[in-house]
């Protein structure tokens, strides 16, 4: 009877071990994809080529980030542009010509847009760091659980093998 119980336990532990190994492989892939995406965000600007080269698991997040970064940068630019334009007009006064004013206005808008994109990238990097820490913690828990299951599996196999030896008929001559 003990042989059956130990055999069932060994089978269950092998199943648990395979599930944990699958989770570890999935977590490792997620961490690798997130690090690749993090590198992409850290470079500053994302092009369509970068988007196409990003991991498929991060495509949705990349698209969401692009929309968020653009909208956030536009909002930042629209909020700060009038103040900067007014400061420039006060400094230059009547000395500027219309072409120079248009060029400066364009420069102000591009600069503020870039600052807004940088701010969005910083927010995304913080979010990515938190997600990476969460994944690393979950991976560590799974690795600990795998070690425990492996030890229990080893003990169950030894107990099963010992029970088989004890159950075997002993012939004496």
Q: What are the residue ranges of the model-derived segments?
A:
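Amphipathic alpha-helical assembly segments
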Residues: 61-121
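Amphipathic alpha-helical polymerization modules
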Residues: 1-50, 96-173
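Extended alpha-helical coiled-coil "stalk/arm" regions
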Residues: 35-74
